[in-house]
A protein has these predicted regions:
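Active-site mouth of glycoside hydrolases
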Residues: 1-90, 99-107, 136-141
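Substrate-binding clefts and catalytic carboxylate motifs of secreted carbohydrate-active enzymes
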Residues: 27-31, 54, 87, 96-219
Length: 219
């Protein structure tokens, strides 16, 4: 829980050792301490994420930091989002189409579910919210990357309908040709909008445990 002091204390100690241990490894391009933190509070979470960013930069100033991949960013060198809409046109609208009353698309201005804390002030007879934090939204000065998209469910034979045993995103592609067609439409859409987006990462080419969303089988 990134909203607790105890979690922050333990993670900071471990993360410091991780960065120092792997500092010179050539395969590391970007530090990504967190993934999909969607439920931040307004006090401990911003402090914790900022501390991790600062600590990582102090140890290794040479690499960019994607502080919270696909989640609620506070301070970061790369702004990242995750979205698994399967229809390429709908995905384009979500990522790039300006919304009414805004100069940006929804995904640039959205905020995740903030967890407010009710605290009692001394001498006050009822709980009041005394934590207030203005979460940042994307600004074009830093790279914007869709670092998770796709996840196309692909089962060519004997599809399993029980999501506890097998799952992926969207309706299953029943042949490799169906899979490639859907994948191509998504990738082409992103390339056509390359002036806005800096990069993207397809998830994923191989099956993982119960996820059947790759073109390479788990075995």
């Amino acid at each position: 829980d990134a909203n607790t002091v105890e979690a922050a204390r333990n993670f900071i100690a471990e993360w410091k050792n991780v960065v120092k241990r792997d500092l010179n490894h050539p395969s590391i391009v970007t530090w990504t301490p967190f993934n999909e933190e969607f439920w931040p509070d307004e006090r401990e979470y911003p402090r914790f994420i900022t501390d991790i960013y600062t600590l990582t930069k102090e140890i290794d100033p040479t690499r960019p930091i994607n502080t919270v991949s696909g989640g609620q960013h506070i301070v970061t060198d790369i702004w990242t989002e995750h979205h698994y809409e399967q229809d390429a046109e709908k995905l384009r609208q979500i990522l790039f189409e300006k919304t009414e009353g805004s100069k940006d698309a929804d995904i640039f201005t959205r905020k995740h579910d903030v967890q407010s804390r009710l605290r009692g002030n001394v001498g006050y007879n009822r709980p009041v919210l005394n934590d207030s934090y203005e979460f940042p939204i994307y600004k074009s000065e830093i790279p914007y990357i869709l670092d998770e998209f796709g996840g196309i469910k692909c089962i060519e034979a004997n599809p399993i309908k029980d999501r506890n045993l097998s799952w992926g995103y969207g309706n299953s592609a029943v042949t490799k040709e169906d899979f490639y067609k859907r994948l191509e439409s998504q990738v082409r859409m992103l390339i056509e909008n390359s002036k806005t987006i800096w990069g993207f990462c397809y998830t994923q080419l191989t099956d993982v445990e119960l996820e059947q969303n790759g073109i390479y089988y788990y075995d």
